[in-house]
């Protein structure tokens, strides 16, 4: 990567409404390379990010899942339960969403996107 520079293309803070209902439908950040979230306020009663398997072939097979509490190749999606201070970074092409927030506890996080461009 010595011939590239990393640039933040976007960064913003989001807080889901105190009355609940905040969410993001499944999407990707097609024009970036790395995306991430830094969680400022969250709990077991707030929204969670869900990451979906981007492989098209995954939709065609339905492997049995032996233990839903462990990550395995059979899973189509992975739910992450962050704690305050959690930093998640992932490939921007990875489909992800935020489940509908209940509004019980405060939920605030920072989004950011990074792009590598030739120097």
Question: What do these predicted regions represent?
Answer:
Residues 2-11:
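A short coil-to-beta-strand element that immediately follows conserved catalytic motifs
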Residues 5, 28-32, 104-106:
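A generic structural micro-feature
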Residues 9, 45-47, 106:
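Residue-level signal for beta-strand positions within conserved beta-sheet cores that form or flank
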Residues 11-13, 36-38, 110-114:
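A structural signal for short, well-ordered beta-strand segments
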Residues 13, 49-51, 98, 110:
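Generic structural hydrophobic/aromatic packing signal, biased to beta-strands
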Residues 15-89:
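Catalytic core of non-heme Fe(II) oxygenases with the double-stranded beta-helix
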Residues 70-119:
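Catalytic core of Fe(II)/2-oxoglutarate
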């Amino acid at each position: 990567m010595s011939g590239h520079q990393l640039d933040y293309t976007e960064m913003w803070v989001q807080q889901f409404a105190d009355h609940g209902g905040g969410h993001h439908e499944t999407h990707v950040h097609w024009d970036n390379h790395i995306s991430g979230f830094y969680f400022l306020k969250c709990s077991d009663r707030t929204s969670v990010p869900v990451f979906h398997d981007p492989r098209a072939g995954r939709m065609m097979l339905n492997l049995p899942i032996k233990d839903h509490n462990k990550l395995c190749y059979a899973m189509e999606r992975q739910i992450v339960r962050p704690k305050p201070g959690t930093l998640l970074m992932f490939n921007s092409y990875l489909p992800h969403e935020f489940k509908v927030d209940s509004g019980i506890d405060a939920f605030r996080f920072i989004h950011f996107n990074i792009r590598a461009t030739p120097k």
